Amino acid sequence: MAILLGIFEEGLIYAIMALGVYITYKILDFPDLSVDGTFPLGAALTAGLIVKDISPVWALPLSFFAGVLAGCVTGFIHVKCKVRDLFSGIIVMTALYSVNLRIAGMKANLPFLSQDTIFDNEWTRNSLPASVRPYIVVIILAVIALICKFVLDWYLNTRSGYLLRAAGDNDTLVTSLAEDKGRVKIIGLAIANGFAALAGGVLAQKQAFFDISIGTGTMVFGLASVILGTQLFHRFGKLKATTAVIAGAILYKACVAFVISMRIVKATDLKLITAAILLLILIISDSMKRKGAHYA
């Protein structure tokens, strides 16, 4: 049961980030590596605020808006400075390493074990029935992930959301509608990095500490979740893509946990496992596309 809870906990946290990757990878077709910097940005800001006795609840929206700002910078560098998309993300990701250290007080590790978090506070300790307490983390994470999903679903059905989709599929259409396709891209990158930073803040509160290396491989996890979810559940026509992404994140975390539980590799090889599983998913996904094209 503990392993299952761990899978859902980690999967739901990274599902929030994967929703952002879905925007950049699937909708905008933008290889945004700044996610590896905005994820720890959210964690660093959350840790810094909680250490200063700021409410852990308020720390999350503030982390989201910090990610939005970072995403705007990535978009500005790409759109206004005419820097290629890949390089824009790398520049911001690199710069955020120093920014995150400064936010954390120049500390590579910032614990706040004695502070209240959204998962461990007076209400969760004293007001909940004993039978519910073991599941409170999963419940809270599910609520946050679902809120993010429904907000994104709502946004994608607005005029701005339709323009965002068009910017990825046919940016000429955006221009023909007298809209600035560059501005639309910046908005998409802002929202995507906002989700990444929010996920980082949630993870920091779950672990009760910030670590500067917390964002390493974030983009890989997000890509794997998006590809796995959308490829595996695309046959279910009524299933929204955002739901598939969340399911993909949980399933991907389950795959990683399964490989570790087999004791073939050590837990310290987590990043190696993550990369290997992503490679396998990409190979299978490409094979499925080729078969589909062959029978079409």
Task: Please identify what each model-predicted range represents.
Residues E10, L86-F87, A108, V137-V138, ...:
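Loop-to-transmembrane alpha-helix initiation sites
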Residues A196-K271:
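Transmembrane alpha-helical segments in multi-pass inner-membrane proteins
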Residues A70, S131-D211, G215:
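Helix-loop-helix "hairpin" substructures at the membrane interface of multi-pass membrane proteins
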Residues I23, G48, C72, F76-K80, ...:
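Membrane-interface helix caps of multi-pass small-molecule transporters
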Residues D85, I91-V92, L96-N157, I187, ...:
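Transmembrane helix-bundle core of multi-pass membrane transporters
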Residues I3-S55, L60, I77-C81, I227-K238:
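Single transmembrane alpha-helix segments in multi-pass membrane proteins
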Residues D169-R183, F236, T243, C255-A296:
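Cytosolic-side transmembrane-helix boundaries in multi-pass membrane proteins
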Residues V21, I54-T94, V99, A145-L146, ...:
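Alpha-helical transmembrane segments within multi-pass membrane transporters and channels
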